[in-house]
């Protein structure tokens, strides 16, 4: 059978099968803000949408509604450090960050090419690589250095068919942020696709610097959107921002975005008001997440079999469990104990036993779930003796 994932096994894995059989469990994997009480103020959304209905007229633009691009440029002008973005030529509005990734894969690669991506990452990259018939080469993150990128691995993995480097900063799920220039990227000269969707959720650092500000001389496509920043995954809007060295790709990217025109006009028209009036919500959401992370880390600090590093940013914790059992067995036993977490191998990491926990989960479910996690882990590790 030809086509996408034609030969793949898409049946449910043992963890999903067990989860479907259990009803009384607390889900500590949830990343949906609308299911965790983080709802962007409806009065602001109503205000943002009202002018569209009064003057409704579809005027498609392959780069996105100019007012939306102006709002995005204004956002980057307020980042630390600030980025100067030309809304006329540097911004492309998309239906989502995932769509922006797909556009950039189409822009930068041909079948048989390869891109470098972090070894620990979510499955999106693998699916995109399959879609575009390219090779995904995984570069490791160094756990001894706070999951920092190993520059020598980037150099080792690249060859004449390497077309781009994917960087997720803040990284999902380790929370690592690239805070300084990586000289080998300058030497390679490859375009960088930088995913910054967790940029407004710092924890162990005061702010998340835009990579395009840290490395201004390398072609960088910066991706973000309203799904994480404003807890609006249902309104479907993202963007790609080009720094000056990346402008050479703008004309071809315009053709690609014009081919899809995925971003809907209503959400684009709402964006200036969302960004202008949404700052208080962003701060409130950040404070809730920071409090949740601190609560969970304090609770886990008393558990001898657990090691957890404070994330630079984001809302995930990447937890190491000191056990002889494999991750799948641990997660299945935790499900039986009434709590659901993801194993590290779901994110492509197969060293030791790591669990991924979302601190977006609302109280009291978060504290109750963490208590079940702690109790379950103590029983699991006790069985190792």
Stretches found by the model and what they are:
Residues 213-290, 297-298, 376-377, 382:
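Conserved core segment of the aminotransferase class I/II
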Residues 143-208:
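Active-site phosphate-binding strand-loop segment of PLP-dependent enzymes
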Residues 66, 86-112, 236-238:
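Conserved beta-loop-alpha segment that forms the PLP phosphate-binding cup at the N-terminus of a helix
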Residues 272, 288-297, 308-321, 351:
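Conserved glycine-rich beta-strand-loop-beta hairpin in the small C-terminal domain of fold type I
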Residues 7-96, 274-277, 379-380, 385:
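N-terminal small-domain helix-loop-helix segment of the aminotransferase-like
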Residues 113, 134, 187-191, 196, ...:
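A short helix->loop->beta-strand "cap" motif at the edges of active sites that frequently abuts
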Residues 74, 78, 82-85, 155, ...:
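PLP-dependent enzyme catalytic core of the Aspartate aminotransferase-like
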């Amino acid at each position: 059978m030809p086509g996408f994932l034609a030969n793949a096994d898409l049946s449910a894995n043992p963890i999903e099968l067990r989860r479907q059989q259990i009803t009384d469990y607390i889900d500590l994997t949830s990343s949906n803000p609308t299911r965790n009480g983080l709802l962007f103020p409806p009065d602001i959304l109503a205000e943002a949408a009202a002018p569209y209905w009064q003057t409704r007229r579809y005027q498609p633009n392959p780069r996105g509604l100019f007012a939306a691009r102006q709002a995005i440029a204004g956002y980057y002008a307020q980042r630390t450090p600030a980025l100067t973005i030309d809304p006329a030529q540097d911004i492309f509005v998309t239906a989502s960050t995932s769509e922006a990734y797909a556009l950039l894969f189409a822009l930068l690669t041909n079948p048989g090419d390869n891109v470098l991506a972090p070894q620990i990452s979510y499955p999106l990259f693998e699916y995109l690589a399959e879609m575009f018939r390219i090779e995904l080469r995984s570069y490791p993150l160094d756990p001894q250095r706070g999951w920092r990128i190993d520059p020598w691995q980037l150099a080792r993995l690249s060859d004449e068919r390497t077309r781009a480097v994917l960087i997720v900063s803040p990284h999902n799920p380790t929370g690592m942020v690239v805070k300084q220039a990586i000289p080998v990227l300058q030497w390679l000269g490859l375009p960088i696709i930088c995913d910054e969707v967790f940029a407004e959720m710092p924890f162990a650092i005061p702010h998340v610097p835009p990579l395009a500000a840290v490395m201004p001389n390398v072609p960088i496509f910066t991706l973000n959107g309203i799904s994480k920043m404003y807890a609006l995954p249902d309104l479907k809007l993202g963007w790609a921002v080009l720094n000056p060295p990346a402008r050479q790709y703008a004309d071809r990217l315009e053709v690609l975005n014009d081919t899809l025109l995925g971003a809907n006009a209503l959400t684009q028209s709402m964006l200036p008001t969302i960004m202008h009036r949404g700052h208080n919500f962003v701060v409130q959401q950040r404070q809730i997440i920071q409090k949740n992370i601190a609560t969970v880390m304090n609770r886990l600090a008393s558990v001898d079999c657990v090691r957890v590093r404070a994330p630079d940013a984001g809302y995930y914790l990447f937890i190491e469990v000191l056990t002889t059992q494999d991750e799948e067995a641990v997660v299945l036993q935790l499900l039986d104990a009434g709590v659901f977490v993801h194993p590290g191998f779901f994110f492509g990491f197969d060293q030791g036993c790591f669990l991924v926990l979302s601190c977006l989960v609302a109280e009291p479910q978060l504290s109750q779930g963490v208590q079940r996690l702690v109790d379950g882990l103590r029983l699991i590790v006790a069985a190792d003796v």
